[in-house]
């Protein structure tokens, strides 16, 4: 085989994992829940075996979609071995490197980040301070703290249930290049805490109408060992 395409529909689950409750995801079955609430027209995916894979995973047919039909692809349903539920864990495992050690997570406290981390980030990046320092929804926190950020120049830092350190900043007032440089510094600092990703969350727009832009960038820890893509030793083109 001279060329292969690996397509990932991230977060489109076809059945809940046995440990879903551990992560607050009991009852998760994303594709089934979507199919139960609206009509899906996905003939090509069904021919490739998506419906059959969903049935294999949960023992139930997808609502509103044919339970049988001609399948032109090979299909299967896998159960994740990795200890985490985040994006890098799943992607690495699909590439042959499951994550068998726990990621570092930040507590649901305010502040949620240790002072040694935030103090070092402020000093290294010459910042006037930080806003947020909590668990939050990305869209909600820019609506809440966006004005204070623009006025003060303090970036917004927050986390979630995943192993992430997220930094939001206004593309015009703070600058996209400066935000990305800040995230590179943060990536170095959070390595000590075994955090999976630092995520740049740029936003734009006027007060009251802040919107996240498409310039998000993820800074992930490298896989702990070579993936299948490394072992194939070929040219890799990544999109997305």
Please state what every model-predicted region is.
Residues 1-5:
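Extreme N-terminal starter segment of soluble prokaryotic enzymes
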Residues 8:
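Generic enzyme active-site microenvironment
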Residues 11-170, 174-177, 201, 209:
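Active-site nucleophile/metal-coordination loop of metallo-enzymes that catalyze phosphate/sulfate
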Residues 169-170, 176-240:
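Extended, H/D-rich, highly charged conserved domains that either
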